[in-house]
């Protein structure tokens, strides 16, 4: 019976329901019990609380939104605190950088004028100055027809500051120094932009900071920075020239002080120049044996006292000093220490007697030995100093400083304030005065320089070297590589100055970078740059001394014109200062 269902018309088999017709009847509706209160539920009837439900929903949503806003605000405040903690140090660093950049901008803008300003001292203040301040100033005179000048520590640097101050008084920076310095500054800006952040080269102007660094770098060409030596190369050179003069002149009254020896340098140089030619059959050489010298290094390697044997051979100045017995033979050139020099080479057995040490004791009295052959770095620098003095004599020979002043690019009256020049001192102010002075000056200008310029500076600074006295001479020697490339029959004028001064540009860049960096450039890099410039200066000395017509060659190739040198008067000031300023009108 479980398989049958009772319907109104009778019983049917369940399996036959697909083909059977079942009449509609309540008894035939197979479904679960239907809810009795279904049609009276809330879906089909309106409740009295219908209006309150949306308000509750809105209130719930409002509370949820308020809670979300509170959470978001708390999170934002926490994030702001964290961001502030991270950004505050960065903001402080950025502020410091901005202040530093602003200070550098102001310094670069004002360095050309305000930083160079020196306080003007009137007559009443000058009378009230302490005695020690007045004594610290050195008085020198370069040209005979100019008044003496006083300076503090460095004439070239002090006068350079005065040049920019005098031009900045009119609210302009129109000062130029020739194409050589222009090319040098442009090359520095291109190759070492970091070093040029502290200089003002806007609108093509020449920077005072750059010019000061360049002049100081030129003055350092002949200085020795490794080792502690009681004597300078300039002092050793003066003593050697004095002894050489004594060797060729028996009847001569000599001074008793070292400053007196300096004033006699023109006489000594004249006699030494004659001795150079007398002892040489062929052409005098002014270069060492470069194959035996250390590469890219001026000092003796390893801190020793001697170069490789034969490294200093071939230089006419050294050979003349040995021939005149001013210097003893170079150690090792006459035999070893175990073998004595034979009588056939040294009859008097005086080959190793050093008169330079005796002269240093007599004139300088420092209780320190001076054996140049034992300190061959100092010997090399001494030979270069004597060669530079010979070159200076040739440059200034027969110079006429009494020509028309309007032909000179250097006008001292436009630079030095309150310059009262009397009629007696203003000779050469017109062409008529120059026509009255047609006689040759010979060595007079060099003699005047030694008496009124070199000697006072040496008295003020006993450690001064020749390149510090004559930075312009060093500039000409550094430029000599350009002159050497000109063939005798080559008529083109070489104006490619910048590419020949890579070493000097590097040294200037290092000096400028050291002024800005908290951690300076390593000392080895500084010494390498200095040695490169010193070696280039040494090669330039040899190249210029080989020129048979030195002045004519420099003028024909416009090597003097690139330094603003237009006359003998300009050349005299150029070798002493290292530059010739020209004041230009503002554009």
From Swiss-Prot:
**Gene Ontology CC terms, in alphabetical order:** host cell; host cell nucleus; viral capsid
- Quote the subcellular location field of this record: Virion; Host nucleus
Against InterPro entries, the record matches this protein to: Herpes_UL25 (IPR002493)
Question: Main localisation, per the record?
Answer: virion
Region of interest (Disordered), residue spans: 113-132
* A Pfam family per the record: Herpes_UL25
Region entry Interaction with major capsid protein/MCP, spans: 1-53
**Which keywords has UniProt assigned to this entry?**
Capsid protein, Host nucleus, Host-virus interaction, Viral genome packaging, Viral penetration into host nucleus, Viral release from host cell, Virion, Virus entry into host cell
* GO biological process terms on file: symbiont entry into host cell; viral genome packaging; viral penetration into host nucleus
The record's function comment reads: Capsid vertex-specific component that plays a role during viral DNA encapsidation, assuring correct genome cleavage and presumably stabilizing capsids that contain full-length viral genomes. Participates in the interaction between the capsid and the tegument through interaction with the large tegument protein/LTP.
Q: Which family does it belong to?
A: Belongs to the herpesviridae CVC2 protein family.
How is the subunit organization of this protein annotated in UniProt?
A: Heterodimerizes with CVC1. Interacts with major capsid protein/MCP and triplex capsid protein 1/TRX1 at the pentamer vertices. Interacts with the large tegument protein/LTP.
* Protein name per UniProt: Capsid vertex component 2
Source species, please? Answer: Equine herpesvirus 1 (strain Ab4p)
